[in-house]
Amino acid sequence: MVYSSCESKEPDSVSASNHLLLNGNDELVEKSHKTGPENNLYSQYEEKVRPCIDLIDSLRALGVEQDLALPAIAVIGDQSSGKSSVLEALSGVALPRGSGIVTRCPLVLKLKKLVNEEDEWKGKVSYRDSEIELSDASQVEKEVSAAQIAIAGEGVGISHELISLEVSSPHVPDLTLIDLPGITRVAVGNQPYDIEYQIKSLIKKYICKQETINLVVVPCNVDIATTEALRMAQEVDPEGDRTIGILTKPDLVDKGTEDKIVDVARNLVFHLKKGYMIVKCRGQQDIQEQLSLAKALQKEQAFFENHAHFRDLLEEGRATIPCLAERLTSELIMHICKTLPLLENQIKESHQKITEELQKYGSDIPEDESGKMFFLIDKIDAFNSDITALIQGEELVVEYECRLFTKMRNEFCRWSAVVEKNFKNGYDAICKQIQLFENQYRGRELPGFVNYKTFETIIKKQVSVLEEPAVDMLHTVTDLVRLAFTDVSETNFNEFFNLHRTAKSKIEDIKLEQEKEAETSIRLHFQMEQIVYCQDQVYRGALQKVREKEAEEEKNRKSNQYFLSSPAPSSDPSIAEIFQHLIAYHQEVGKRISSHIPLIIQFFILRTFGQQLQKSMLQLLQNKDQYDWLLRERSDTSDKRKFLKERLMRLTQARRRLAKFPG
């Protein structure tokens, strides 16, 4: 790691006696000489630091960040704020430089400290499916630029796609940073007109996450209140709980304003809970003079040591790149340890959710014919099982939904009410009909004798009125069953559009066939009802009850609801007698029609319809030439399944790695 005199303020630091400088492939200015207890403490530190960072880096490499936010340090700043210089100083490698937008893709900078001083520098640039191994720090700038062009294209466009730069060296800190494009306010040249919006959207995507520490780079020679990067950080982190300010270019401060910069660095002006650090990196003149990063660190150390105002910040541990490196590593480790339990729960919940979602899309379709046959058998078997559940009234329903049988029973209850209402509402008309028939058709019978023809004619007319309502109920229930069967097809075959279409076609064909048979049976029943018949003992019992009820009402001088508008029974004994017979027969025929019509509908429209559909679906297995056609998926189904499987695999691997983590 990088150490400096800032460590003198922290005697318990494992690096208190070290003065390693970050310098890429340059030689060390001062080498550490760790002995005894210090060396043991350093080893313990390395044992804790590296596994934490490696864990998060490995999760990021798995792509877990596509599903969940991971602990990270995001580096943001306005253009020309010195952001690139800070990253160069930390990593020891030169990153793409130039005017305008240089960072055009988020760059994950993974710094790994090698234990042995003799270990050679190595690097790796990864993006999409490409991995470029680097053996020299001088290759970094070129390869990162090439990666940006490959992702974002030539020009000045930006992309949300990540580039990973891994640097392993004895002279870098254990740290992972995400470098984001510099904020620009005005589009210049051939930049997109909305470049400011694009960049800010990309930055917000990272800094808004609670798992991200925001490293805001601010030049000392500008008014901190006008800094866009700090304003954006404040929007997503109003309390400054996860924001660290990095003050750059202290050598460009106007004379007489140094005290103001010291106040800012001491967190007295624009308060952040994590405070500020101040660094001096290579300027443009240093770069032109080819000042090495190692020499730049020496120059920075000397600058703060000799500066009348800023030397106090150095003594307080608030200044220089080495102090910043140590601070960032410490912050990242604490942040990782703090967020790991939450991350573990999030991964567990996401894993469960994706597993459930993946079940909806089923398994992959086998390639071989035998496998396809068994796959189709399973699909049709599941469909037929659901149809059986519907027939038996045992299907599973979600909250607030009714079973099919419940909906049918409701229709049957309405039918029973229609039958009862038909007879009750007809009593007024019946009285008039009885009088009409008596006046027109009574033959040589004396008054008081019941005319059976009158009774029979009225009964037939009353029953025939119910035929069309019965057929209407048949159509209503048929639609309910058809919709229920279609829903089962959609549930089981939704991803296989040809299979679903075939099932729907069969449902429609069988529905028409069974509906026709049911209607024929219903109309036949009403034809049979034109034969006035009831078992003698049943009819006698019904007639006796009607007479007893009438006698009781007469005795109590109360009018039954049925006789509110009818003439008094005593006014015409013949009419009263026929009326009693009509009521008795209505009661029995009403019971018969109320029960038998629903029975016909259940038999043809539910049971036979379902059974015929099941047989018809099984017949699909006989035509092997159609397997491919029937099992053709929707265009997005296989892609969605593949996407979910990849997510599930990532999260499964993430859970395993978290389980193995010693922390």
Swiss-Prot record:
Q: Where is this region: Bundle signaling element (BSE)?
A: 342-367
Residues of the region (G2 motif) are: 102-104
- Listed InterPro entries: Dynamin, Dynamin_GTPase, Dynamin_GTPase_CS, Dynamin_N, Dynamin_stalk, G_DYNAMIN_dom, GED, GED_dom
Which stretches are annotated as coiled coil? none
Phylogenetic classification of the source organism: Eukaryota, Metazoa, Chordata, Craniata, Vertebrata
| Residues in GED domain copies | 575-663
Q: Which parts of the sequence are annotated with region: G5 motif? A: 280-283
As for family, the record states: Belongs to the TRAFAC class dynamin-like GTPase superfamily. Dynamin/Fzo/YdjA family.
User: Topology in the membrane?
Assistant: Peripheral membrane protein
Name of the protein described by the UniProt record:
Interferon-induced GTP-binding protein Mx1
Question: How does it associate, per the subunit comment?
Answer: Homooligomer. Oligomerizes into multimeric filamentous or ring-like structures by virtue of its stalk domain. Oligomerization is critical for GTPase activity, protein stability, and recognition of viral target structures. Interacts with TRPC1, TRPC3, TRPC4, TRPC5, TRPC6 and TRPC7. Interacts with HSPA5. Interacts with TUBB/TUBB5. Interacts with DDX39A and DDX39B.
**Per the record, which residues fall in region Middle domain?**
367-534
Q: How is it modified after translation?
A: ISGylated.
Q: Which GO terms describe its cellular component?
A: cytoplasm; endoplasmic reticulum membrane; microtubule; nucleus; perinuclear region of cytoplasm; plasma membrane; presynapse; synapse
